[in-house]
Amino acid sequence: MIKKILPDLIAILAFVLISFAYFFPADIEGRILFQHDTAAGAGAGQEAKEYYEQTGERTRWTNSLFGGMPTYQISPSYDSTVPLQWTQKIYQLFLPTYVNLTFILLLGFYILLRAFGIPAWLAGLGGIMWAFSSYFFILISAGHIWKFITLAYIPPTIAGIVLAYRGKLLAGGILTAFFIALQIMSNHVQMSYYFLFVILFIAGAYFEDAWRNKTLPRFFKASAVLLVAALIGVAANLSNLYHTYTYSKETMRGKSELVQTGDAAKQTSSGLDRDYITNWSYGIGETWTLLVPNFKGGSSSAPLSQSEAAMEKANPMYGSLYNSLPQYFGSQPWTAGPVYVGAFVLFLFVLGCFIVKGPLKWALLGATFFSIVLAWGKNFMPLTDFFIDYVPMYNKFRAVSSILVIAEFTIPLLAIFALKRV
């Protein structure tokens, strides 16, 4: 038994060491990273925090935002999720902040690859490929922690789905229910919603395989188990989901009482304004950042004066101007950094397109292309308009460029499949 799980234990220990090493020495010196969104959230919750300290009761209303709004939209807290919160701490091995984030990112993708039957050493490499793409550390620096944690729980959720379709119904159902519950508790529904498309692609691949092998009853049985598991995971967070749903009707995500007509119409029948949805759209040419990180300059927060290549040809007379200009020159209003998966990983992905066989390869290819094109947003409006108008809930979310997290997931996954074939 010990011999069988020893490679997995070694991988987990390696992930802990890697996570500590990445944040060294800050993780042992008690340094605190300034994160804009985290600081803004702390400010918004200060009134509710002071009320709790004075009375010992949690208020469900604050005047700190938008002239007054429910606190459960700022920092949801429900007694029903307390067991989940403790389970989450155990899963994170009670590691310190930031170290725990990197650890669960590594571990989640490792679990997924092991569900596919990938050897432990190769699954460990896959976890590193996934975790150390640029986007996740940009999320940490910006303070988008809920989004980060939600994304960390998505690979093990899909691992449960894979196990179920591979015939391990009990293990697959438990894993799916558990990580769906953690995922929704992390409170970034947009990321969970986007990965429903990935799940559809993967389920489609297993359906095709079942059709070819005449094992459709087994496929539908696994699908039924997964549906029950999903309902259990959702039910564990029903309080938060219900309150979010009811409150959303009174916000800009609900149906507008004022309707524009004619060419000026930008408002969807219900949901966000089209311009607001697509304001952060990845440029078509900007897609090259998957291969070349600074193809569009890099970060908006980095001044042009810090670019050695640009300064070699710059006129020194305009030095103060260069300090105020960003390095980024893409189509988004601003960005903290590019979506970069790594040249080596992308090479393996392309290799996988040729040497990996079976419907799962086409599912991953389709999901990759799908996410890239949808991330273009206002730069490819025919498809974007179709999704806004006809795909349920798509118009509830803004910053369509963030759907590129799908490509960040599928590219290293197919890359590891390619390495297994080599």
Question: What positions do the PLM features span?
Answer:
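Start-transfer (signal-anchor) and selected internal transmembrane alpha helices
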Residues: 1-24, 221-230, 350
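Membrane-interface junctions at the ends of membrane-embedded or membrane-associated helices
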Residues: 1-5, 162-174, 206-221, 357, ...
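Membrane-interface helix-loop-helix junctions at transmembrane boundaries of multi-pass membrane enzymes
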Residues: 4, 211-224, 308-322, 348-378
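Membrane-interface coil-to-helix junctions
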Residues: 18-112, 116, 128-151, 265-268, ...
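Membrane-embedded alpha-helical segments of multi-pass membrane proteins
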Residues: 100-104, 148-156, 196-197, 341-344, ...
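Alpha-helical transmembrane segments of polytopic integral membrane proteins
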Residues: 106-110, 154, 158, 238-241, ...
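Membrane-embedded helix bundles of polyisoprenyl
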Residues: 108-115, 121-209, 222-244
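Polar, glycine-rich mid-to-C-terminal structural blocks
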Residues: 221-282
